[in-house]
Structures are given as structure tokens and as C-alpha cells.
Amino acid sequence: PVVDLVEKSGCIEVKTDKSAVISQDVVLATNAYIDALPKSIHHGINRKILPVESFIIATEPLDQATADSVINNGMSVCDNNILLDYYRLSADNRLLFGSDSSSEKDMVQIMRRNMLHVFPQLENVKIDYGWAGPIDMTMNASPHFGRISPHIYFAQGYSGHGVALTGLAGRIIAEAILGNDERLRIFEGLKVPSFYGGKYLKNLATKIGVLYYKFLDRYR
């Protein structure tokens, strides 16, 4: 793993435990895992994001009639809740269903309950897989792209829209590295509030926030 970045004569020395690499430019694209980096690398941009767990289950392959009763146009779908449900069919007609769960221990059972609330016709369908992983959220859901220095770039804060935004981020940063930073400067102008208090306060804020948004989704 990288343990430090040192700027030297217009280049960046990327240090590891065993060696070092000299690079003209460096892009930090660690997203929800940025807290694992030393501050000498991230320079405090970790305060702009909050890691939040995302949970997904996958059903067994559905017969075509059942699949069509769920989604019949091949689209990916999400609802308008704050803690939203999102789902699509895979190439082999599995329903991939993502939603909120507050406990990884019983995540599959909670997710199945959420799925059946939307698609009760799947009552007798087996769940083959379930998994979880962190995504990086900003306080106002704006993406956070920019520069720490003239040769150190970063892209984070996709807030659940990484499939669409990561390609855009890569192109915009590549343009800037090649000398055209017009589009990057637009994103650098976005106001992205900071989260303060370190890792433990972030974890507490996440738990409180989930409960608060669940309340809003239920009663608004």
C-alpha cells in the first residue's frame, strides 16, 4: 500500500513500505476507503465524505413471466425515498435489490422483507446471494472532484451514483492533466460541507442519520 506522497521538482514520489515510484501526476480515487490513508496523502479531504453501507441481495434466476412482472423494459429503477430502494434485473434474470439495512448480521432477511414489500409476487423465490460494501456520501450529495496540489487530483463523493459519475470524473481529470481544466474548475467551485469529529463521530453520525431518515421516509 501507498504510505506517503512527496512532491519533488514538479513530480510526485509515491512511497510504499518497500519502494517508491516517481509520477508526473497522481489521482486519489479511494472513495469510502480514504480514511485508511495517512493525512499526508489525503490532506483532510476525507472530511468531505461519510462512508455509508450499501446492501444488495440477488434472487435465484426468475422465469420470464415473473421477471416481466417485476421489470419488463430492462431499466434500472429507484424510488424517491431518502434511504431509497433500487433494483434491476441481471442478464440471467435475477432481481438485484438494494436497500437499507441497519444490521449486517440479519441483512439478507431485512432486505428480503424490503423486497417483498415492493414485489410481493416473489414470496416463494429464493435469495441466492447477499453482500454489503461502503459508498461515500457528501453532506449535500454533490460530487467532490478537485486538486490537492497542481499534480495531485482527487475524485470522491459519488453519493450512490458512481456508475454514472466515475466515468465522467475520469474524463474530466484526464482533461485537466493534459492541460484543459475548464470542466474540473466547475466541480471545484461546488460547495461541499465538511464532516468533523473523526472516524468515531462519523460512525455515530451515520447511525443517527439512518434512524432520522427512516423516520422521515415513513412519516413524511
Pin down the residues of each PLM region.
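C-terminal catalytic lobe of FAD-dependent flavoproteins
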Residues: 97, 105-218
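Active-site substrate-recognition segment that forms the wall
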Residues: 4-10, 19-150
